[in-house]
Amino acid sequence: MEIIMNKDNLIDEEVTDFSIKVRGIIEKDGSFVVGKYDDVYLLPGGKVEEGEDLSNALVRELKEELGVDYSCEEMIPFIRVIHYDKDYIKRDGSKVNRKVDTMYFIVSYKGFDLDEVTLSESERKYGFSLGLLSSVDLEEISKMSSANPRREFFNSELSVVLNNYLSKESYKVFEKK
């Protein structure tokens, strides 16, 4: 499945910042493993490096962010989101016309302890934390107001992805205790 989010009707010729990302949907007891900073919620994952395929990129990102070893065989492609945003405000305050192509995978929960994950210096600097997000919390974050201008970009995509996941009952069988 592919979803295009483009509220400003940007065309590719107007895009000044493009990246390819991967993220993992990891469900634990009806909630989802997420990272949070400055009112932004993200599923674990990140940018695909040059020459890296999508599955291997997610294996690397999950090891970096959660300290857990996964293999490509443990990931099920779920949904691709192509998200455009006009005048996206970067961390440095500059504005870009952004296009992010993100592939989301369903990944089994492997029993790791979120409190035991070691955060990087950069993550600690930005107040990053790991936690669980319930479907009730998911509804609430879409209503939150925030001083962070990037919040809407990330949280709206998270909402679309997880609501699609929750509507697919057959995907709920991958959790491992």
Language model features with spans:
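Acidic, metal-coordinating catalytic segment for phosphate/diphosphate chemistry
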Residues: 1-23, 95
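Hydrophobic transmembrane signal anchors and adjacent membrane-proximal interface regions, especially
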Residues: 3-5, 9, 36-37, 77-81, ...
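Long, hydrophobic N-terminal alpha-helical segment
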Residues: 14-55, 60
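Nudix hydrolase/Nudix homology domain
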Residues: 41, 113-177
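A general secondary-structure boundary signal
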Residues: 42-45, 58, 100-104, 150, ...
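Unchanged
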Residues: 48-76, 82-144
